[in-house]
Design a protein with these regions (language model features):
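Alpha-helical transmembrane segments of multi-pass integral membrane proteins
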Residues: 22, 211, 215, 246-378
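Interfacial loop-to-helix junctions that mark the boundaries of transmembrane helices
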Residues: 45, 201, 236-240, 275-278, ...
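Acidic, glycine-rich loop-and-beta core segments that form the ion-binding/anion-interacting portion
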Residues: 198-200, 204-222
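Flexible interhelical linker loops that connect adjacent transmembrane helices
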Residues: 226-237
């Protein structure tokens, strides 16, 4: 079944913002450059930058479920499962496998970053199968890029998503409540049954509520879009009033999110960071949902700020940027790039090293992401499209006489 993928331009800007702040957090971990906007400190925003990963997960769930939500509203059949898996593989696997293998052969092996051959084999095998978050040495201590765990969690979710989404279409309340119950039960065990959370805070079970909120957001969006479509036929006042309200709500939600991030940044140690991250994950999910549901209906200046050719381009390379940036910034320090006077320039607060390192880290990561996207991912996607077209069965011949379909053959709406 062929499906037309819709785009919501404003979400390009939100995706770019989320991934930019996450990468800024990782770069800050290496540079310790205190971010200032004039006299206003952005330190809290960068220190809590890991929270925006939750926003990317919610955005993924929202976009994945949107065709199902539209089908629910229209009374149409669910999207084709084979097409779902093909699109995910086409989008993710070429760039991901290239980056993992490039880091393995170009950095990990030449720099002898593995302590033993069995560990090397285990690390590579688990990364190729997206199972590395299940093991401490391949998740926390891997030399193949610590940021790639997010994609592993997403791929695990993709494997289950069509089944869960069809369940939500049939019994939304029951299935969504089950997702929340499983997630909150697991999280309660983590928070009150454990004293260290590194191996549980970012497992798929701990993100089920974020996925569920994303699905609810998709259902709300199709209703809001239908209402906005009716309002667009009215007078200028009737069109602008909802847009102004959406803009105000967007700004209020963004302010609330910043307040939550400021609170998160006051965590006194790593254990408290992860405990708060789990406890307040639903609150952050609701904040991100507010941004997703208001941005597409806001006034034109805000919509153009978020949805424009620049954000569309950056959104297109964002996955490869995310996958590659953390490995690049760590390897830059191995190479002493840029050169520094002190052995630990980040601890010494060495300038201009901190500024130069930060700018170079952003620039190199962006450049390599563009190269991987346009030299590897897109050509591979075209090859996969041609391969899929060859495997597609030929269309059945049109019969010459009238055919009256039986009940099982009747066309579906």
């Amino acid at each position: 079944m062929s499906e037309r993928r819709e785009r919501i331009p404003e979400l390009d800007g939100l995706r770019v913002l989320m991934i930019f702040i996450v990468s800024w957090y990782h770069i800050w971990q290496q540079s310790w450059l205190r971010p200032m906007l004039g006299s206003y400190s952005l330190d809290y925003l960068v220190r809590s930058g890991y929270v925006w990963v939750d926003g990317t997960v919610l955005l993924s769930s929202f976009l994945l479920f949107l065709p199902y939500a539209q089908a629910m509203r229209d009374g149409a059949p669910p999207p084709d499962t084979r097409s779902f898996y093909f699109r995910r593989a086409r989008r993710i696997l070429p760039g991901y496998y290239f980056i993992i293998l490039a880091v393995f052969f170009g950095i990990a092996l030449p720099w002898k970053l593995y302590s033993s051959a069995p560990y090397m084999v285990k690390d590579l095998a688990t990364h190729l199968t997206f199972t590395f978050p299940f093991f401490y040495d391949t998740y926390i201590a891997t030399p193949l890029g610590a940021a790639s765990w997010t994609l592993a969690i997403e791929v695990q979710a993709y494997a289950l998503f069509p089944l869960v989404a069809r369940g939500v279409m049939k019994r939304p309340a029951a299935v969504l409540c089950l997702l929340f119950a499983v997630c909150f039960g697991f999280r309660a065990w983590c928070v009150w049954g454990l004293t260290e959370y590194s191996m549980v805070v970012n497992q798929l079970l701990n993100f089920l509520d974020v996925y569920a909120v994303g699905m609810l957001a998709a259902m709300a969006f199709v209703r809001l879009r239908a209402h906005a479509g009716k309002a667009s036929a009215g007078s200028l006042r009737k069109r602008l009033l909802p847009q102004a309200l959406a803009t105000v709500l967007f700004l209020l939600v963004f302010w609330a999110l910043l307040r939550m991030l400021r609170f998160q940044a006051t965590s006194k140690d790593y254990v408290e960071i992860q405990r708060r991250q789990m406890i307040f994950r639903p609150v952050f999910a609701l904040c991100f949902t507010g941004l997703v549901l208001t941005a597409p209906f806001a006034l034109l200046p805000l919509r153009k700020l978020l949805g424009n050719p620049v954000t569309r381009f950056l959104g297109g390379i964002s996955m490869n940027y995310y996958l590659i940036h953390q490995t690049i910034i760590v390897h830059m320090k191995r190479l002493h790039l840029p050169p520094s006077v002190s052995d630990e320039p980040h601890m010494a607060g060495e300038q201009p090293w901190q500024t130069h390192y930060t700018l170079l880290a952003f620039g190199l990561s962006l450049l390599l992401a563009i190269l991987v996207t346009y030299a590897v991912e897109k050509p591979a996607a075209r090859l996969l499209d041609r391969w899929a077209k060859k495997r597609r069965p030929p269309a059945a011949a049109v019969p010459s006489g009238p055919v009256f379909p039986g009940p099982e053959e009747a066309p579906r709406p």
